[in-house]
């Protein structure tokens, strides 16, 4: 499951209540949700987890991760000042990155990843197809992704997109939430004038493409005549 979209804002979620992605999505109202990074047997996240400046977990490394600043936009940075979630760096500016992986992370497994297109759009990968890191890098490069991070995978891989979902019975302590930014419809001067001057009713304005009857046309023309 893959989706590429304009992201308006994102959030790191610390799942202390052990909610499912569906429960979190219903509670918060995000458009996309995926599992986060690795965790230990005590349900504690490993690597860096920072939420609004509060450090939940940390390690000795200062590598790239999902960094969310005051504007709410996720980026692949090392800045941990706002919100931050670690990941395994896969790509930067279209170049493959390599990090030493433990055997359980390096093996073929279901994968979750977050990437960025050259134009800034976010690419989310959440799929049960078993891939190595190198195969995932190849898939993301094929989609045109320039920057990318690999998150937890295997049985942790889970997510919900507007057009699909990947399920898992495993609860995970961190998740990433995204809100797709919808393009605002272009303003139509004629419709704005009709609204401002009472030429069209609220019902007619709500359905601008609907054909009008002769009676409705006569009423519109009559209202225009009264204004002159």
Please state what every model-predicted region is.
Residues 1-182:
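Gly/Ser/Thr/Pro-rich low-complexity, intrinsically disordered segments
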């Amino acid at each position: 499951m893959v989706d590429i979209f304009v992201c308006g804002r994102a959030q790191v979620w610390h799942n202390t209540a052990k909610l499912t992605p569906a429960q979190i999505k219903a509670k918060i109202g995000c458009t996309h949700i995926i599992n986060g990074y690795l965790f230990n047997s005590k349900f504690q996240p490993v690597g860096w987890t920072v939420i609004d400046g509060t450090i939940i977990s940390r390690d000795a490394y200062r590598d790239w991760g999902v960094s969310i600043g005051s504007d709410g936009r996720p980026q692949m940075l090392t800045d941990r000042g706002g919100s931050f979630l670690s990941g395994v760096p896969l790509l930067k500016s279209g170049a493959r990155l390599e990090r030493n992986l433990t055997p359980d992370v390096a093996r073929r497994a279901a994968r979750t990843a977050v990437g960025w297109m050259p134009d800034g759009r976010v690419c989310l990968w959440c799929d049960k197809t078993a891939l190595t890191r190198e195969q995932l890098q190849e898939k993301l490069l094929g989609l045109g992704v320039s920057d990318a991070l690999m998150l937890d995978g295997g049985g942790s891989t889970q997510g919900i997109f507007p057009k699909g979902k990947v399920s898992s019975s495993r609860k995970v302590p961190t998740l990433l939430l995204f809100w797709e930014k919808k393009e605002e419809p272009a303003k139509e001067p004629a419709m704005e004038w009709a609204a401002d001057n009472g030429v069209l009713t609220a019902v007619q304005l709500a359905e601008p493409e609907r054909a009008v009857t002769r009676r409705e046309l006569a009423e519109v023309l009559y209202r225009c005549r009264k204004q002159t």
